[in-house]
Amino acid sequence: MMLQRSCIVLFFSLFLLVPQMVFSMLNRTLLLIPHPDPELVAYQVQWKVNASITRRQALDTTDQAGSTPCITGNPIDDCWKCDPNWPNNRQGLADCGIGFGQYALGGKGGQFYFVTDSSDDDAVNPKPGTLRYGVIQEEPLWIVFPSNMMIKLKQELIFNSYKTLDGRGANVHIVGGGCITLQYVSNIIIHNIHIHHCYQSGNTNVRSSPTHYGFRTKSDGDGISIFGSKDIWIDHCSLSRCKDGLIDAVMGSTGITISNNFFSHHNEVMLLGHSDHYEPDSGMQVTIAFNHFGEKLIQRMPRCRRGYIHVVNNDFTQWEMYAIGGSGNPTINSQGNRYTAPTNPFAKEVTKRVETPDGDWKGWNWRSEGDILVNGAFFVASGEGAEMRYEKAYSVEPKSASFITQITFHSGVLGVGGRNNNLGMWTTTGSEGTSGLDSYNDYTDEMSGAGSTNRLSFSVLVFLLSSISYLVVFTSSTQMFML
C-alpha cells in the first residue's frame, strides 16, 4: 500500500511539472483541423456575393424615390450596415463572416470592454482601461473604443482567445512595437482598425494572460502575426508600412478570412505558410475577399506555401513584382478579381512560382476563373486537367467581377478618418518609420516573437507523457501484485 501511495504521489508531482501552457498549446494544435471540403466553402462565398448583387440590382430597378439603397453587393457589409440599429447590436457582426473564417466568434456573448486609456507603459502589468489589459483576459470580450485614439505599443500586443476589436465609430490607430500577435489562440475578430508603422520589438517579458507572462524574443515587426491559430477574421482594416509583413499566418494556422481591408505602401504584404516543408501548413485554409490592394505595393498579395487559398473579388491596382506567389504546392483559387498590371512590361504576370523549376510547378493547382485582367496582366494557371476539375457545372458563376468597384468601394477603415492611414504623422526613418521595403528575406525557422517560455521541445513532451503513462501502468501492476 505504501508503494502504491508513493507512485500516486509521484504521478501527480510529475503531472504538475508539465506547464499548463504545454497542454493548452497541445490542445489548440490538435484542434487546427481544416474544413473537409474547401471547394464547398469557396462555392458558398460566391453564392453569397451573387445573392447580394442580385438584391442590389432588384433594388435599383424598383427604387422609385431615387434614394440610394443600402444593399451594396458586398455580403458582409449588407449583413450589418443596413441595420440602422447596429450600434446597439454590435455583436451581430459576428454573424456576418464568410469563408474559412466565418466561424470566428470573437467576443460574442461576452461583456463589452471599453478602452479608455491609450497608453502602453507596462507590457507585464498593464493598467485596466488599456487595450493590452483587455486583450489578455481569459473570458470573451467585445472591445470597443469610446473615442479616437492612437495606441503606440511598446511591445507585441498578445491576444487571448475569444476577443473582438471593434473600432466602428472611432478613429483607432495601432502603431509601434510588435504589433498584434495571435499565437495559439482562436476566435478573434479585428474590425475597423488602422494598423501601420509596426517595427521589431522583444527581448523582454510580455504578459499573454492574467496568469502568465514570459520572455519574448525579437519579433519580426508584422502588422498582424497569426501563429498556430484558427478561426480568425480580419475585416475593414487599413494596413501599411510595417517592418516585415502586414499580415502573416504560419505554423498550421487555418480557418482565416481576410476581408474588406485596404493595403498600401508596403513590400511583402502577406505571407501564408511557414516553409515549403512544414506539413501542418497543408491544412491552412484562407479566404481573401473584397480587399483593395492599393498604391505602392510590391509583392506577396499573398505569397502562399501549401494550403488552400481562395482569392475572390479583390481589386489589385498594380504591383511592382507580382501579385500572387507561392511555393510548396499550394492550391490557389482565384475568382472574380480585377488585376491591373503595372506599366513595367516585365511585371505583367499576376502569378509567380517562387524559386521553383517549371517542371515542379506544372502540376500545382492554380486557377483563374472570371478574373478581369487589365493593362496586359496575365495569370499563369497550372494543374493537369485543371479546367475540367475547376469549371464544373456550378449554378453560381463568378460573374461578380464586373462589380468589383462596387464591392470594394468601402474597403479599409469605415467612417471617421477614412481608410487611408495618416502617413504624414510619421517619419520614414529610424525604427518606428521603417516601411518594410528593405525586408526581402523569407521566414526562417526562428519565428517572430516565439519566446522560449512558450515552447517545450517535442522530445521533452514525449518523455513526460511517456513517464506518466508508465507510472499509471506501474501503479496498476503494483496494485494487482499486492492483491
From Swiss-Prot:
GO terms for biological process: pectin catabolic process. It catalyses: Eliminative cleavage of (1->4)-alpha-D-galacturonan to give oligosaccharides with 4-deoxy-alpha-D-galact-4-enuronosyl groups at their non-reducing ends. The active site is at residue 300. Ca(2+) binds at residues 220, 244, 248. Glycans are attached at residues 27, 50. Residues 1-24 form the signal peptide. Its cofactor is Ca(2+). It is an enzyme of class 4 (lyase). Pfam families: Pectate_lyase_4. The keyword rRNA processing does not apply. InterPro entries: AmbAllergen, Pec_lyase, Pectin_lyas_fold, Pectin_lyase_fold/virulence, PEL. Its EC number is 4.2.2.2. Pathway: Glycan metabolism; pectin degradation; 2-dehydro-3-deoxy-D-gluconate from pectin: step 2/5. Binds 1 Ca(2+) ion. Required for its activity. Keywords: Calcium, Glycoprotein, Lyase, Metal-binding, Signal. One of its GO terms (molecular function) is pectate lyase activity. Belongs to the polysaccharide lyase 1 family. This is Probable pectate lyase 12. It comes from Arabidopsis thaliana (Mouse-ear cress). The lineage of its organism: Eukaryota, Viridiplantae, Streptophyta, Embryophyta, Tracheophyta.
